[in-house]
Amino acid sequence: PVEILRDAWGVPHIYARNMHDLLFGQGFVHAQDRLWQMEFQRRLISGRLAEVLGQPVLDIDRHMRILGMRRVAEQEAGLLKGDPRAKVEAYAAGVNAGITRQPLPVEFTLLRYRPEPWTLADSLSWAKMMAWSLSVNWETELLRARLIEALGPELAAELEPRWPDHWPVVVPSAVATVTDSRSI
């Protein structure tokens, strides 16, 4: 059994007796809060946006199919065994429970379709897309390396934006320690 409680700010708190139930709950919460984002990314990664958005995104689909992230994720899904596989499957089962047990986001109504069941390969694809999207600054890193080579590290550092030492990295009022559900 899993219990999902939301605090006054809508933040979900998942209580479970084992990892399977916890991951099921996490998948369910993700479906509640982010189903359209998950579906859009799944279609983007798979090169299947044009199926619902039409001709204007066909070039994006072609590009994503050439990159082949979905194809690799499907191959990896076939290789995943034992506990790691069970964990990702528990998460997917939670997403699917969320899809079937609650109203769909308005985007599905507007585009007149229902999402397909979430799969292990969908989760692996998502991880690949996230890694790719977080690594797109390679051009900036290459430029930085060229500047260091041409100017030297000290002079190149002068071109970097400065972050004053007295400015916080984390806003103190946003930091909270939760010791039990009453402290929220």
What are these regions (language model features)?
Residues 2-184:
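Substrate-recognition/specificity elements adjacent to catalytic centers across diverse enzyme folds
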